[in-house]
UniProtKB/Swiss-Prot annotation:
This is Large ribosomal subunit protein uL15. It comes from Parabacteroides distasonis (strain ATCC 8503 / DSM 20701 / CIP 104284 / JCM 5825 / NCTC 11152). Part of the 50S ribosomal subunit. InterPro entries: Ribosomal_uL15 (IPR030878), Ribosomal_uL15/eL18 (IPR021131), Ribosomal_uL15/eL18_sf (IPR036227), Ribosomal_uL15_bac-type (IPR005749), Ribosomal_uL15_CS (IPR001196). Keywords: Ribonucleoprotein, Ribosomal protein, RNA-binding, rRNA-binding. Belongs to the universal ribosomal protein uL15 family. The keyword Transit peptide does not apply. Residues 33-44 have a biased composition (Basic residues). Coiled coil: none annotated. Residues 21-31 have a biased composition (Gly residues). GO terms for cellular component: cytosolic large ribosomal subunit. GO terms for molecular function: rRNA binding; structural constituent of ribosome.
């Protein structure tokens, strides 16, 4: 046995349909396209979205909404996360750099602190935005809020 004698396994390959190669092939004549009509002609291509003449779905449904190019998408971080960070690393100041080092945000993200959970540590917190409840909780614990 050598490379020139190799053949594919029995039944693993099928012979290709050779359409339009005369009547002896069994696929000559109309070449599986039927008789006449637009679909039998050369260059026929089904139009994308065409539904046989009925009003297509993309024209039946209304247009709605838009994408606001000025939207700022904040990365939300709760005060209970700040509490855990302060306890684990004995921090008094939590800013963007500390959140990046801890892996909560990437350098391009904008941060908003939310008021879910409880905060007992006295912290100086730096962020781009704060919810009212988060701001109140940080100040109630004796901390300060710095908006960037």
């Amino acid at each position: 046995m050598n490379l020139s004698n190799l053949k594919p396994a029995e039944g693993s390959t099928k012979t290709r349909k050779r359409i339009g190669r005369g009547p002896g092939s069994g696929l000559g004549g109309t070449s599986t396209r039927g008789h006449k009509g637009a679909k039998s002609r050369s260059g026929y291509k089904n139009k994308i979205g065409f539904e046989g003449g009925q009003m297509p779905i993309q024209r039946r449904l209304p247009k709605f909404g838009f994408k606001n190019i000025n939207r700022v998408e904040y990365k939300a971080i709760n005060i209970d996360t700040l509490q855990q960070m302060a306890e684990a690393k004995q921090l008094t100041k939590i800013g963007i750099n500390e959140l990046m080092e801890a892996g909560f945000i990437s350098s391009s993200q904008v941060v908003k602190i939310l008021g879910n959970g409880s905060l007992t540590a006295k912290l100086e917190v730096e962020a781009h935005a704060f919810s009212k409840s988060a701001e109140a909780a940080i100040q109630a614990a004796g901390g300060t809020v710095v908006k960037l």
